Amino acid sequence: MNNQTVVIGASWFQEASFCEQKLYLGKVKRLPLIKTEAMKEGALVHEGKYQDFVKSAEPTTWEEFFKSEQLVTSREVELQHISNNVVLLGRIDELSCDRDGIYVTDDKPNDYAYIGIRKQIWAYCHLLENNFKDLIQKPVYAVLKNRDNGEIVWKEKYTGAHKEQFLMAMLRLRDVLSEKRKPEPTKNPNKCAVCQYNKVCEFSLAK
């Protein structure tokens, strides 16, 4: 049990921030989750952006990509890294590079970078650094972009402090998913009210 390897998706950090108990019910207890209209719309928007990107994309190597001083962009970059008995998986919505830095961008229909969203993007930054550590010679920036209007909601240089905060969150989530730690349910009844598990969750505050 102590050496159990746990798979964690980068997007799970946002879910855990919403409610660890909900994530536990879905990922460990495997209770079915019905896709909402918002989830379906999000998938369609991402697919549309990817298809638009493919039409104009020019092949290049990762070495050329990270050395570029002109703005270059890739989309739907899938990465994984194994450490601390965790297989971390992630798909970066948009990865860009210019002379000043590398930009790890997530598209969401949000106008505020909640901590769960930031941890998700830091997960992508962590994956990027561990997959391309020999190629990255520029600062890495975490970016949240509004999916609908394209405006940048949040942009911040990825630092050692962010990495430390992310790693602590990853180890906590590892212990929740391996059932070494009890998940913490939300204390916000508004979250319970919109949760698909509110009829079966013993901690639900929905009335």
Q: Where are the model-predicted features located?
A:
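Short small-residue beta-strand/loop micro-motif enriched in glycine and branched aliphatics
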Residues: 102-106, 151-153
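Metal-dependent nuclease catalytic regions and adjoining charged, substrate-binding loops involved
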Residues: 70-87, 111-112, 130-207
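Structural signature of nuclease core domains in nucleic-acid processing machines
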Residues: 98, 107-108
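Short, surface-exposed beta-strand-loop junctions and turns on beta-sheet-rich folds
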Residues: 31-32, 110-113
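Short, charged, amphipathic alpha-helix that recurs within catalytic cores of restriction-modification
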Residues: 117-130
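Metal-dependent nuclease catalytic cores that hydrolyze phosphodiester bonds in DNA/RNA
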Residues: 1-102, 207
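A short secondary-structure junction signal
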Residues: 106, 116-117, 205-207
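Acidic active-site catalytic centers that drive phospho-/nucleotidyl reactions
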Residues: 93, 106, 120
